[in-house]
Amino acid sequence: MSPLSEYALRMSRLSARIFGEVARSTDSKSMKVVSLFSEQPLAKKKETYDWYPNHNTYFALMGNLRFLGLYRDEHQDFKDEQRRLKKLRGKGKPRKGEGKRATKKK
């Protein structure tokens, strides 16, 4: 069998570059690096990003259950109570346009 022509070699290298293959044969250490880079990144693997539940969904669902009275979140109850007491003392957030900077200008 005749060796590949120069054109065929160039086309095979170009094809390898286009399709993400190794263009020229290398030793096993380099091939290990190539295989590591060809794998999917750790953050894109399903077992990594599916490890924890979807917190936004759970937070919204628990908020709805709390609103309906089917779930009691003591920490949120405490925060609401503190906010209510703060407002009773007149320490609530000022309305828009009534902050410290707005009163300085007038």
From Swiss-Prot:
Compositional bias per record (Basic residues), positions renumbered to this chain: 84-94
InterPro entries: Ribosomal_mS33
One Pfam family linked to the record: MRP-S33
Subcellular location, record wording: Mitochondrion
Top-rank taxon, per record: Eukaryota
One of the protein's GO biological processes: mitochondrial translation
Cytoplasm as UniProt keyword: no
Keywords of the record: Acetylation, Mitochondrion, Ribonucleoprotein, Ribosomal protein
Record-listed N-acetylserine modification sites: 2
GO cellular component: mitochondrial inner membrane; mitochondrial small ribosomal subunit; mitochondrion
Region (Disordered) residue spans: 81-106
Biased composition (Basic and acidic residues): 95-106
PANTHER family xref list: MITOCHONDRIAL RIBOSOMAL PROTEIN S33, SMALL RIBOSOMAL SUBUNIT PROTEIN MS33
Quaternary assembly: Component of the mitochondrial ribosome small subunit (28S) which comprises a 12S rRNA and about 30 distinct proteins.
Family, per entry: Belongs to the mitochondrion-specific ribosomal protein mS33 family.
Protein name: Small ribosomal subunit protein mS33
Protein species of origin: Mus musculus (Mouse)
The organism's taxonomic lineage, starting at the top: Eukaryota, Metazoa, Chordata, Craniata, Vertebrata
